[in-house]
């Protein structure tokens, strides 16, 4: 992936975010964040009080009140800036995608076949079901399915990957995306969406996040913050009559400052930015999430369903051994296996030819000179081979060869059954070779488990995540590979129905399930899974069923998706812990200062020995504003993430963000108080 990464504080983004922060000062924008709306009202109230004091309409220190008012407005601006900067980064990423959209014309065919009469129409007028022709050099005008032809397609504008991909009719590689370019040949495409509903349109809308809905956890946290704010609002409101009864009423400006320092403004100001940044980080991994809900669900996932091929193993099975049947020498088996594989262009077939050459110096023969009939592999027969000089040689799965032998009046040897089981237990795939009705032996095809994958699964296990390998292999082979890879469980001989049933079973147990898929047959399971990552190279049905799309089409990305989701949840939790711990420290600064005149005994709480009541209150308000700015990078980048158990993670966060939240305000408020005193500002 080569998509350009944005700097955290890109100058143009910062300038734009500052402008947006000022625009967000209007009440319509502010009421969406209840905590910051209280600060906004406090800012407005203290501004009015400052003006009244300056005009002589009210008694009091107009300069002090104006300073408090100014820093309260700055607090609101900083919170707006954090959200605007996160949104600006997402919009910048969306703008790079908008550059892919081009106003162009399309050749709309009157009949669904190559060579039919074509009408030139604007691409944005194409409707679902329309048939278009695209040739080398053309931009594909719509999302759709290839119904005829095959071509090399440059998808770098969407995926960031420069290597072209093949798109052709039939199978799982028939889906094309509007905005990509044909490099060679031609395609006849049936449009699958209406204007404004293309994959690119959805990507842009999702990335911009203009209509980003709050996730369930975000709503729950917002309710908690509102509850805390109401409690502190009521507590602060009752303080005025107490102080008035004591003979020295506390000013409204001080009460507003006290309220703002008590309520959780830090997390209140950063909450939206954390959510927007989570989706932005997902895009940085080249994964498009349909909503923040999908990203959040990724953080709560506790079961991963992983395809064996390409995710756990390298996916290119290689012939590793010839195991002859009783009474057959290994060279005879190798010669027959090589002959049966001469026309087999699959990686497995080529590896059989090469292994026979390496073991017994059996040179690859000229296919044309053999005057033989080659039998291709089909899904029905599940075997392939060659007919040459009255010899009928076949290689294939155990069941297919067994049926072939019995159909030709032969008997499948018991010793070969044992050898098949032995190969399967070692994690390899057995292919049986037969000549006529005589079974010659077994070829072991070994799929290599990816390096480091066992360690990654161990990390996931530490985090309480169960890993389940999905494979079409038989149970013996699946069990051996599962043991080698270190997964917790496996589903062998998997079918779409079996996958769907397994997901429902885990969900019935109260678990959240994540999986990947690329084919139409994966669509039901993708639709059922809590986190469903569809491959961009997959079918349209798979992409529509999933709630995320991996532009790199890398099944291993599912593990990274879970990490990003957990990092977002950890960031939100860590900053909430820091914010609430912050408030405890601010009590010691502002409460003694606010009520020292009325209740001198409260001076015992002035453990920071701040210069004066005015400097203490102003220092706390200034710190309350500045801490939001200092935490913006953490909100956007996310807290440092390490795979740990839930209890270990909780202890770590309490030490770092709980204790840090207690200590930092003591230091910060004291330093600000000293600076105000030295500069003679209080």
From Swiss-Prot:
Residues forming the catalytic site: 307 (4-aspartylphosphate intermediate)
Stated family: Belongs to the cation transport ATPase (P-type) (TC 3.A.3) family. Type IA subfamily.
Gene name per UniProt: kdpB
Lineage: Bacteria, Pseudomonadati, Pseudomonadota, Gammaproteobacteria, Enterobacterales
Entry membrane topology: Multi-pass membrane protein
Keywords recorded for this protein, A-Z: ATP-binding, Cell inner membrane, Cell membrane, Ion transport, Magnesium, Membrane, Metal-binding, Nucleotide-binding, Phosphoprotein, Potassium, Potassium transport, Translocase, Transmembrane, Transmembrane helix, Transport
One GO cellular component term noted in the UniProt record for this chain: plasma membrane
Gene3D superfamilies linked: Calcium-transporting ATPase, cytoplasmic domain N (3.40.1110.10), Calcium-transporting ATPase, cytoplasmic transduction domain A (2.70.150.10), HAD superfamily/HAD-like (3.40.50.1000)
Name listed for the protein in its UniProt record: Potassium-transporting ATPase ATP-binding subunit
Assembly description: The system is composed of three essential subunits: KdpA, KdpB and KdpC.
Localization: Cell inner membrane
InterPro entries on file: ATPase_P-typ_cyto_dom_N, ATPase_P-typ_P_site, ATPase_P-typ_TM_dom_sf, ATPase_P-typ_transduc_dom_A_sf, HAD-like_sf, HAD_sf, P-type_ATPase_bsu_IA, P_typ_ATPase
Organism: Escherichia coli O9:H4 (strain HS)
Keyword Cell inner membrane: yes
GO molecular function: ATP binding; ATP hydrolysis activity; magnesium ion binding; P-type potassium transmembrane transporter activity
